[in-house]
Amino acid sequence: MSLRPFTGTSRTITQDSTSESNIKKGKNSTKRELIEEVDVNQEVENFDWKKLSGIKPNKLYEKNWQEKVKLKQQSIVSAYKEEAISVTHNAYTTTLFPQEVIKNVKNQGKLYYHIGMMAIGVKGLHRRKIGTKVMIMFYDDSFGKAREASIGSIEMDMNAGCGVFYSCPDFAKYIKDLSHLKIGIQTLGYENYEGKNLSVAIKTIGRLTTNIQSKYKINVKDIVEQISSQGIIMVAPMEIDSSHLDGNEWDLSKFLNHENTSRVPTKALIYQNLQGGESLRFSNYKQTRMHDPTENNSDEDEDLKILGEQLNIKMARFYTMQTPEEELREVIQQLEREKQAMIAKLEAKMKESSKMAIVEDNFNPNNEYLEDTYSEYEDLEFEKLGLTGWEDLDQDSIETEEITEWENPNQVLHREIRAYKSVSEQIEDIFGELLKEHGNYDMALKNLEEKYDLDKIEKAKSIEEIAKSSTSSEIRPTKRPKEEQTAYEDDMRDDWKRKELTVNPIEASKDRNFERIGSSYKKNFYPSRSEILNLDNVPPQFYYDQLVTWEGIVKNEWEARKKDGMDMWSWMDGRITGLVLYLVQDWISKNQAAYNDIKSRGDRPENFVKMVKDRFLIEDPTDERRTALQRLAQRELEALNCEDPTKIQPFMAEYLKKASEAKKGFDVVYVERLFDRLPEAVGKVVKADFVKDGNSYEAGIGIAVSYISTWMRAKCIKETEAKTQKKASLAFCRSIYTIGDYKKRKILKRVTNYNKNRRKNYVRRPSIKKKCRCYICQDENHLANRCPRRYTNQARASLIDGLDEDIVSIASDDEDIENFLEIIELDEFIAHSSQEHEHTWEIGGKKDKVCEICSYFTDYNKTVSCKTCETQYCKTCSDQLALEVTEVKKPTKEETMIDDLKLNVKNLEFRVTILEHKVEMQNLQDKFETMQIRNKSEITEIPTTSLAMRANESNYIKTSINKTAGCYVETKISFNNENRIITALIDSGSTHNIICPTLIPASWINNTHREIIMFAVDNSKYNLNQELIDDIKLQFQEVDETFGIKYKLGQTYVAPKPTKTFIIGHRFLTNENGSVTIHKDYITIQKTTGIYPTARHELKSEFARKHGGRPPLFSNIPETYNKIPHLHSYQPQPILGYKNEIGNQSLITMVKELEALGFIGDDITKNRTTWVCDFKIINPDINITCATIPYTPADKEVFEKQIKELLDNKLIKKADPTCRHRTAAFIVRNHSEEVAQKPRIVYNYKRLNDNMHTDPFNIPHKISMINLIQKANIFSKFDLKAGFHHMKLKDDFKDWTTFTCSEGLYTWNVCPFGIANAPCAFQRFMQESFGDLKFALLYIDDILIASNNEKEHIEHLKIFFNRVKEVGCVLSKKKSKMFLKEVEYLGVEIKEGKISLQPHIVDKIKKFDKNKLNTLKGLQAYLGLLNYARGYIKDLSKLVGPLYKKTGKNGQRIFNKEDWNIIFKIEREVSKIKPLERPKETDYIIIETDASEEGWGAVLVCKPDKYSGKDTEKIAGYASGNFGEKKTWTSLDYEIEAINEALNKFQIYLDKDFTIRTDCEAIVKGIKTEDYKKRSKTRWIKLRDNLLKDGYKPTFEHIKGNKNFLPNFLSREGDFILKCLQNPDSTESYSIDSSESIPLYIDSKESHSIESDDSIPLYRDKLLPLVERLKEKSA
């Protein structure tokens, strides 16, 4: 608790007929009363220090929770001390208790001291008003920091001369620690003062006890009142939140037995500090047992064992024979001799190792060398480590002092050698210590660079140099450069100068990938099979092999692991490391635009791999904290040189590694320097060829290394073929592995013309979904390119020879011909592909094909292809080539219909031909039968049936229906919650859908735009001029007798005559590029797949049920059948409110993609969010239970349906049998749900909510959010589908959500509705997901996208939709609306910058059932509905005041005539609500206030700037209210409270300087002269806090009461006259809101300001008749 001034009502003691002398003497005969006014100066003069001593200790603990008998056993201690002190420059500290009190308390035999109250008085020993200040702090120095130590603090102005403060800490302290409680005092302004300047008195009251209680309840109230009545200001303690410690790690090892142990160092480092002196730093601390000299039973022999056997023996002799000095001197001499012998051995080892050549410095690439200077270090002598002064120890000190562990010096030195740390590790150790010291990374790094010189830290300790030389035979000792050399090259260490990079053949031969061939080494390279790409140890000539291998692995891994919402680029970025990562980072940092262009082509892993291949290991290291390591790597990079041609490969690998570490991978200077560092015979030639081939140094070192490796390979090949050049000049060929015979390269090509006879030659690529066998030996453990038995099947081995890709053979049952491939030679393919013709470029291409130029994959709309030769380019490359792309004109609806009709005509003509042929064949058959059967006189006519309409029927078109043979299905067609169940005929021969007019309502039928002529099978003609309206939905009855997915029926014509049939024709069957397959027992619908039974199946099912069998579909459903959610075609305006005029194809495509992924729709299971709710339980031991609720049959039916849906969507699950909780679920049917015909389940989580910690996350303020969009002109509104269900639940919280219903006990997997903390948790989820989008307003699950113009809105929607895809949430399709000029949001309607109440709220208020007002719930519902209109009706709170009184306990429910007049008046006011406006951000704000006994009123006025004239002022809002009970306030109190209320109402507009106008002159003068600071009344203090809390500077301005026109009316009963003044002809009464601030806009011509007093009579003349007329009406 922070010590702050008491903010309650101050009280002062006044005397009645009593002198001050009597009060000072403590007489009780005076009459004392509490009044409100306080005279501070008088109180200071009457202040008496003894008032502190007058506080009774027993009164403080009078009402303790313990019994009085036990209370007597407690010791209550009161301490008082007073002293004069001098505090000028330094701080003064004193203990809270006098020393004699602390001593007496300790002798009481108690353990704890509870501090009940502390009071301190400070009085200046000088004259008043000298401009000084005093700060007092009550603290506990048991803590190390002031923030935790502070119990309370206060500063006071000594102008008054004195001050008294008190605090009730209410905590206990251990008796021995009472001296830690202190009072600290500092002063300002006493710098030139001499002598005692302050007198301090301290009073404490506490209680001694032997046991600590769980809670002390002390009687503070009476004491506080006593102190407050004497003018003492309260001091409150400080509260510190422990949230910064949440989630910290607890070290359990601290529980181990570390008794009598201490941390002692084992290493010391002496170095030169910044001041030129020497400093000592210890490190390598270890836990060591220490001897406690107070223990009498300690075993001295056990302590002596720590010194080792040798020392133990000598110490034993020391106690018996020698003096301490002699014995210690002998020990030191022995140690010195052993040390010198060890150093001699190690120096010999150094000389031997210095002859060896260096392969490379074993530096840590992740650390840095700094350029600051370091002092010269010599070997540390034992004497310099403080091992002197043994002779100063006496016998007693040796016996009682703890002796640390001693070891043989040889063992110590050997352990140091084994524990040797490299230079980089030393830097890390020092940097870690600096980081702990400063607590800031940048500050620690700065101190590291300032203090230490990395060139010299290697020689800091000679023991480390010895260890380094002994562990690496190839490293030579370093030498310090000469001080006088200043050139960069000369200033380097010897091992950093340019030198020849050599390889130790003995060490190299240990690598399993090398084998010795003659005098050279041949590399048998096997690429790593890891999905993480690391080329640090890969020779450059095998980079391609490794990259190709990695490409196949990482692509398969991505396809296997990818999920919706995963970012491919982030995932692939985690699959590279080492120098690859460094170079990739470096390239991106310098080519950000190119990188973004690659990302824009689509999320394909091939693009990322291609980027790594082309740019050769690129990325961006922007971490500036690695500058020291970069400098070290840069110096090593410049030191590299190669003179031996056979060592070019390892030299380039090292050069590339150092360049990537130094971030010089794309530095032109270092790329060119790579060629210069090569052997002269090679470097000049390859450099010239590199430039000649058109390469640039800007391509990077990776490209240069690859070019050099390729160039050397070509030279070696040429040398091998020609065999004429001397091998001396091409000595590097010994390190290059070449292929003896060059073979033609082969590639895979998709099979376009399948030939059954060549099936054995077809292959396919490996698939992660199927088992793959080797193409050669059929082994599942490897593929053909790595087959160890490659030549067992030489025919197949020769077929794949030269093929770089992995392949597998075609299985015998594999019929996926589209994925069959054939192997062809590359030359043949190029010759075939390079046929010359005139290309015709169009938008679009194959998705699995790359660009012919850049080899990147692109999306369909970003691809250009030639339809003749199928050559395909990306949009970027086509723009660079300036190709002329033919825009394919999208056919109109009429053209599409004409084309369809033409196609149908051709089909019908073909069918007619077939039918004629069948008729002819039938006639021939009849003639044949007639000739054979002559004995029959009559020929039986073959009955024929027709399924088409006949023209010769007048009333009805007869059809012969055989349901056992035709494809008839049960369907449901619906529109606007009205549906019909009809038996339909699936007829693929019918061109259109045709329905009988008697089967559907007449309201579903529209006239066609033109008459359609239809021909039947018998060529009869029919004219169709009616069709069904759009948006008719069609559902099929499924096997389980439920109707499935809704399909769009499409264009359906109404038959001209009744047929009693519904024919589903070709138009529906081929709708949405799908198809319908008709089987005997069922039909299958492709794309939107479903299986629906026909009438034949129903007969079979009925037969099967009678004989105990199963329906055929339940036992005969194809294995491949799976219900796929229907993909609705995107129709912009009806579905999402999208304007056809926008025409932004990319936005439409994006919406279609989101619909396809399910992110726009009504299926909550499509969400891919990973957000997990973290609800905190207060008491985990509580069981949540409930009583059983009876359910009606209707409730059970609802439960059965909705619970099944929740289970199918996996939102809930069956509860665990061991679950301890259950919450009741019940059905709610209110008006809105009855209209929608969907009752909902409600869960009573009240007990669970009571047992949960409240989530502190704030829900946004509605008014503040509305103000953010006042400039927007175009909106899009979205709503998340079942918003809370997007959040997952932690496993340990799921059981708490278990609920019971008629169907059983179930547990939620996602966050259910009804959890109290769910809105806050969901708002946090929305802020984390979309909070950075400044144009998106988020209010729980409502999202509003607001933009200034249409173009900006399109870009905002694209960004928003991409974020939706990343987050994986589902937007409700029904509630999504885009490109709106006006929108309803948060209860208001926004249009053209104006805000009005939503129309449906107005309708609800006007149409509210008046019969419900006589009931308490009905009246409460009506008043709650009126809260939405508070911001739009003046004085509404005053108007509805009588109605609120009816809701009380004693309120009368029955409405009388006046009550009904209030209701009717409210309805009239609601009908007059007009749109409102808000002040602009640049406007200057003025608040005008006035007050009366009836209430207060305020007006918000705005103008363009502070200095604009009054004619520019406009009223932007107003507020009013009452003061509740009538209080005995003065007029000044009312005016002050009116300003406070106005500041609170208009707080959101007060973010800058403003002006307050009031007709109270006392307030204006008091503020300007700061006289208000001397007042202690609560309202003045509250006014001061309101004025200063936000840091703005208000200006007070006084106006005369007759000019304070509108605020004056707002604060009185006659405030309704304002509206009468605006509308003199009106006879209605008006009122102004009493609780809410209401934005309002009035034109400048109607400004309320009155310039002169002369105009007042004019207004009075208008007002008086109106008042009289209104009074008569009300009477």
Swiss-Prot record:
Post-translational modification summary for this protein: Polyprotein P3 is proteolytically cleaved into several chains by viral protease.
Give the residue ranges for region: Disordered: 1-29, 468-491
Q: Which PROSITE patterns match?
A: ASP_PROTEASE (PS00141), PEPTIDASE_A3B (PS51817), RT_POL (PS50878)
Quick one: a GO biological-process term for this protein?
proteolysis
Task: Name the catalysed reactions.
Answer: Endonucleolytic cleavage to 5'-phosphomonoester; DNA(n) + a 2'-deoxyribonucleoside 5'-triphosphate = DNA(n+1) + diphosphate
The residue ranges of the Peptidase A3B domain are 970-1077
Query: Per the record, what is one GO cellular component?
Result: viral capsid
Residue ranges constituting the Reverse transcriptase domain according to the UniProt record? 1208-1390
Residue ranges covered by zinc fingers (unnamed): 772-789
Q: Where's the motif Bipartite nuclear localization signal 2?
A: 744-760
Q: Which residues form the active site?
A: 987 (for protease activity)
Q: Which domain of life is it from?
A: Viruses
* Pfam families in the record: Caulimovir_coat_dom, MP, Peptidase_A3B, RT_RNaseH, RVT_1
Instruction: Give the Enzyme Commission number.
Output: 3.4.23.-, 2.7.7.49, 3.1.26.4
Molecular function (GO) terms for this protein are: aspartic-type endopeptidase activity; nucleic acid binding; RNA-directed DNA polymerase activity; RNA-DNA hybrid ribonuclease activity; zinc ion binding
List the biased-composition ranges (Polar residues).
7-21
Per UniProt, which keywords does this protein have?
Answer: Aspartyl protease, Capsid protein, Endonuclease, Host nucleus, Host-virus interaction, Hydrolase, Metal-binding, Nuclease, Nucleotidyltransferase, Protease, RNA-directed DNA polymerase, Transferase, Transport, Viral movement protein, Viral penetration into host nucleus, Virion, Virus entry into host cell, Zinc, Zinc-finger
Q: Where is the composition biased (Basic and acidic residues)?
A: 476-485
Q: Which residues form the propeptide?
A: 792-964, 1086-1138, 1620-1675
Q: Indicate which residues form the motif Bipartite nuclear localization signal 1.
A: 479-499
Instruction: List where this protein forms a coiled coil.
Output: none
Q: What does this protein do?
A: Capsid protein self assembles to form a bacilliform capsid about 130 nm in length. The capsid encapsulates the genomic dsDNA. Following virus entry into host cell, provides nuclear import of the viral genome. Virus particles do not enter the nucleus, but are targeted to the nuclear membrane through the interaction with host importins.
Its quaternary organisation is: Interacts (via nuclear localization signal) with host importin alpha-1a.
From the Swiss-Prot or TrEMBL record, give the protein name: Polyprotein P3
**Organism expressing this protein natively:** Rice tungro bacilliform virus (isolate Philippines) (RTBV)
